[in-house]
Amino acid sequence: MNFIVYPALDIRNGAVVRLQQGDYARQTRYDDQVLPRALAFADSGATWMHLVDLDAAKAGGYTLAPLLRQMTRATGLQVQTGGGVRSRDDVARILDAGAARVVIGSLAVRESARVIEWLQAFGPERITVALDTRQDAGGVWRLPVHGWTEVAEATLDVLAQQYAAAGLRHLLCTDIARDGMLSGPNMDVYTYLRALVPAVQLQVSGGARDVADVVAAKMAGCAGIVLGKALLEGRLALKEAVQQGSVADPSDPLPCGELTEPVCR
């Protein structure tokens, strides 16, 4: 299994932004250089990227299809993208616009039966289910919905197993407490999921801050990591992240001299 580093761009009103813990009122705007940033991702060695339509995530109706077409043609990157996916037609339109995978988040929690139908219709390589989670006082991983203001009845473990049984291949999981905080991913939740649904390829999301976090995700057996704020703020060099993601394979260990310090601790 190749480990994939997904540089991420969240788009709102045509600009690259980041939300802190998913809060639209706590937004940092960077610039409107969306295509140049994607080209820079490709130049740094990335083969995939993660693209989010924040306008659609709030109001529905994916708006980035023209940009997606331009981006895939100009960069050669494979793109997983989502935001506001509400119907099977939405999935089809986004795939037709050039997406390699469509990311489905809120609906995957609220209407899992529908999303499983789409998974089976389009195939497991074309869908990424994204589950945002928060651990409650009792240690249970809950699934907040509706802008994280309500909590779904289903828990993370139940829903992950349901999707795994239906053939899901790609699961992106975000610990809400770490999202946009540059405090490091909560590897406990990913270790838990790896044991629970070992056949699913797991993507780490939320809190990544440096190359050591990339290596930690790889060494934990995850399939990839989404990098957002750390890249935008220059705390992490994408080229180094891609290189480290490719060498830190626990099934093919290299001598310590061939790895950087975080792996050889």
Swiss-Prot record:
Query: Record's InterPro entries?
Result: Aldolase_TIM (IPR013785), His_biosynth (IPR006062), HisA_bact_arch (IPR006063), Isoase_HisA-like (IPR044524), Isoase_HisA-like_bact (IPR023016), RibuloseP-bd_barrel (IPR011060)
For this protein, what reaction is catalysed?
1-(5-phospho-beta-D-ribosyl)-5-[(5-phospho-beta-D-ribosylamino)methylideneamino]imidazole-4-carboxamide = 5-[(5-phospho-1-deoxy-D-ribulos-1-ylimino)methylamino]-1-(5-phospho-beta-D-ribosyl)imidazole-4-carboxamide
Show the Gene3D superfamilies listed in the entry. Aldolase class I
Pfam families attached here?
His_biosynth
GO cellular component terms given for this protein: cytoplasm
Its annotated pathway reads: Amino-acid biosynthesis; L-histidine biosynthesis; L-histidine from 5-phospho-alpha-D-ribose 1-diphosphate: step 4/9
What Gene Ontology terms for biological process does this UniProt record contain? L-histidine biosynthetic process; L-tryptophan biosynthetic process
Q: What is its main location?
A: cytoplasm
Q: Which UniProt keywords apply?
A: Amino-acid biosynthesis, Cytoplasm, Histidine biosynthesis, Isomerase
Query: In its UniProt entry, what is this protein called?
Result: 1-(5-phosphoribosyl)-5-[(5-phosphoribosylamino)methylideneamino] imidazole-4-carboxamide isomerase
- The gene from which this protein is expressed is hisA
